[in-house]
């Protein structure tokens, strides 16, 4: 891993979730769960992710090109028939066997503040368990405080050991969250 003190050179922070039981997936009224479908999935993923991350990414280059790509791993939440949140229950060879990877969580701005990030992530954690992954991890940026709060609510904990910068960065993140 890189060791430069320059923020752009630092790796994303990592959060891990152990084998503890998952909460039930009981979506709020008016929210539906959909699995990726070829007819609408790529455009819906690009719209949500590009809007949330404020950059342009191609579904084919970022997701479909990965060996982990399977339609059932990309989950959407919808309201009134339109996708408003997405996340992926991914796999990465660099992580130990039995570990799922929570990937590209995005909620459209007009749907924020409804805990949809929580619900789409929980749906992905359930998908990981169906695939035999009892552990989960994710990578995120220090400034994504609302997302980090959601990950804590889902039972994720900070990884303090995988990079020398993590202890100080997590101390700052936790102070910003007032935890």
Region annotations inferred by a language model:
Residues 128-140:
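Conserved GNAT acetyl-CoA-binding A-motif
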Residues 25-57, 175-179:
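Short amphipathic alpha-helix that is part of the acyltransferase structural core
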Residues 2, 20-22, 91, 169, ...:
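Long, contiguous binding/interaction regions
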Residues 104-107, 113-130, 149-153:
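Conserved acetyl-CoA-binding loop-helix of GNAT-fold acetyltransferases
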Residues 3-6, 152-161:
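Conserved acetyl-CoA-binding loop of GNAT-fold acetyltransferases
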Residues 138-148, 163-171:
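Conserved beta-strand-loop-alpha-helix junction that forms the acyl-donor binding cleft
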Residues 1-29:
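Acyl-donor-binding surface of acyltransferase catalytic domains
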């Amino acid at each position: 891993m890189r060791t430069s003190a320059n923020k752009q050179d630092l790796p994303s922070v990592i959060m891990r979730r152990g084998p503890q039981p998952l909460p039930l997936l009981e979506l709020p009224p008016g929210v539906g769960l959909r699995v990726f479908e070829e007819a609408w999935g790529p455009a819906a993923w690009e719209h949500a992710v590009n809007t949330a991350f404020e950059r342009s990414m191609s579904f084919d280059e970022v997701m479909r090109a990965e060996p982990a790509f399977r339609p059932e791993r990309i989950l959407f939440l919808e309201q009134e028939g339109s996708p408003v949140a997405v996340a992926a229950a991914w796999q990465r060879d660099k992580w130990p066997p039995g570990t799922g990877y929570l990937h590209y969580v995005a909620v459209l701005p007009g749907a924020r503040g409804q805990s949809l990030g929580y619900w789409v992530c929980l749906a992905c954690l359930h998908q990981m368990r169906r695939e035999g992954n009892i552990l989960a991890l994710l990578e995120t940026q220090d400034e994504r405080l609302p997302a980090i709060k959601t990950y804590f609510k889902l039972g994720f904990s900070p990884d303090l050991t995988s990079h020398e910068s993590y202890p100080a960065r997590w101390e700052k993140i936790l102070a910003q969250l007032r935890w």
